[in-house]
Regions:
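ABC ATPase NBD Q-loop/coupling interface
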Residues: 56-76
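Conserved ABC ATPase signature
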Residues: 133-141
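Catalytic Walker B motif of ABC-type/P-loop ATPase nucleotide-binding domains
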Residues: 158-162
């Protein structure tokens, strides 16, 4: 996958160039690199939320066939390959309203779902917090709730943008444990976290190159 800093400018310099990797079920690929190299952008490109200059993403489906976003359709791709932002967008209403909205989407109606309230309860999120308005929640509460909602949708791949950045150490470890069997691409700046969760690491460099270890 290749992405220019400004896709509207033909000869704009590259943000990252020809990044190539595969990810097996149950693996966690940690994405590292200094600020501004495109870590969040590459997750958004994989999620088909941000355009890219060249490349293709493929997902091994239940039918054991590799499918592109075009093959599956963008709504299906985003349901299977789900992006979780570092700072969840503050929406109108409560987290429960958000869950109801997601469950109303046609693409979600025939999928298995888990109870996000039950998932988040293990992380210290009590049921009453789901009824509060988003701005009334702390950053850590918002982060845990957004992640619980994503897990409840049971995507094949989670794209995680610093999912524990607003959490205390104990909550961080609980979230890591809940994600231990999941297939993830995970941005972190925490060396200790990388050592705990990663199967492999992708480092993006300021010159648009990358290393995979």
């Amino acid at each position: 996958m290749t992405r220019r800093r400004d896709e509207a400018v033909k000869d704009s310099e590259y943000l990252f160039y020809n990044v190539n990797f595969d990810l097996h079920e149950g693996e966690v690929l940690v994405v590292r690199g200094p600020s501004g190299v495109g870590k969040t952008t590459i997750l958004r490109c994989i999620a088909q939320l941000t355009p890219y200059s060249a490349g293709v993403c493929l997902l091994n489906t239940d039918a054991k066939e590799f499918k592109s976003p075009t093959d599956l359709g963008i709504p299906q791709w985003r349901a299977d390959v789900m992006y979780v932002s570092q700072r969840p967008a503050l929406m109108a209403g409560s987290p429960l309203d958000f869950v109801d909205m997601i469950n109303s989407f046609a693409i979600q109606k025939n999928r298995d779902h888990y109870d996000p309230v039950e998932i988040a309860e293990d992380w210290g999120i009590t049921a009453d917090l789901w009824e509060k308005k988003w701005p009334e929640l702390s950053g850590g509460e918002q982060q845990r709730i957004a992640l619980a909602v994503a897990l409840s949708c049971d995507p094949k791949v989670l794209l995680l943008d610093e999912p524990t950045s607003a959490l205390d150490p104990q909550s961080t470890l609980m979230v890591e444990d809940a994600l231990s069997s999941r297939t993830c691409i995970w941005i972190t700046h925490d060396d200790a976290q990388e050592s705990r969760v990663s199967s492999r690491s992708l480092t993006i460099h300021p010159d648009a190159s990358y290393t995979l270890t």
